[in-house]
Swiss-Prot record:
Taxonomy, superkingdom: Archaea
Name of protein: Uncharacterized protein MTH_863
Family: To M.jannaschii MJ1453.
Length: 223
């Protein structure tokens, strides 16, 4: 279990961290998007946490895509700093999506706030912000492309990995493949297509190759 929370307890425990120089310590690879908790704060150091995908663009650089109208983008634009927090705790992702985390869920590190008990975190300072309009099947939305440089990389003994949805898309596709003979071909194709979209968006070369093989095998099986 992640170091973020003790089972069935309210306040998470503090953990000790080891300092590292770059994102390689978290096994974050360039071109992959990782599911994290981004912590920001206002002028009064009131913390805000939000589940946000962070794109690794180098050993010490990341890119975030933030939607207009959120406290995260407001805080980032205001002070130009944030922390990226790694946790495997499903309740942290859930609670920070459905509402606000309590004040005691945050800890201070220098002039930054981070998620108390996170398996790892790193400080980040904004390098540039570009505003654009995103158009997709859901319509149009304003988006801020935030490029940032990682500073201090802190890792606890509880660290296992930074979440990347690509591998889960592959696993879900393999489960669907094994049930192909009992499934509606149209529904199955739609399911695999959605998983392929996820893998291509957030995964690396191996996830993309895995999906290619699954799709090829599936077509041979049901055609």
């Amino acid at each position: 279990m992640s170091g973020a929370l003790k089972e069935n307890s309210g306040k998470p425990s503090e953990v000790e961290y080891t300092h590292f120089k770059d994102l390689q310590a978290l096994e974050m690879e360039r071109g992959r998007l990782y599911e994290t908790i981004v912590v920001t704060w206002d002028d009064s150091m009131v913390g805000n946490a939000a589940p946000i995908g962070v794109l690794c663009t180098g050993d010490d650089t990341v890119t975030l895509y933030l939607y207009q109208g959120t406290r995260t983008v407001e805080n980032v634009l205001n002070n130009g700093r944030f922390t990226v927090n790694v946790t495997l705790d499903p309740l942290i992702f859930t609670d920070s999506t459905l509402g606000d985390l309590e004040e005691d869920m945050f800890s201070h590190y220098r002039d930054f706030l981070h998620l108390r008990g996170a398996d790892a975190f790193f400080t980040a300072e904004v390098v540039s912000v570009k505003k654009l309009v995103k158009r997709d099947r859901f319509g149009e939305s304003e988006l801020h492309v935030v490029k940032a440089r990682a500073g201090d990389v802190m890792r606890a003994e509880s660290f296992r990995m930074a979440l990347n949805r690509g591998i889960y898309a592959v696993i879900e596709s393999l489960i669907a493949y094994t049930r192909a003979e009992f499934s509606d071909p149209l529904v199955l194709r739609e399911r695999i297509a959605e998983m392929n979209r996820v893998a291509r968006k957030v995964g690396g070369p191996r996830e993309k190759e895995a999906m290619r093989r699954i799709i090829q095998a599936l077509e041979s099986k049901i055609s």
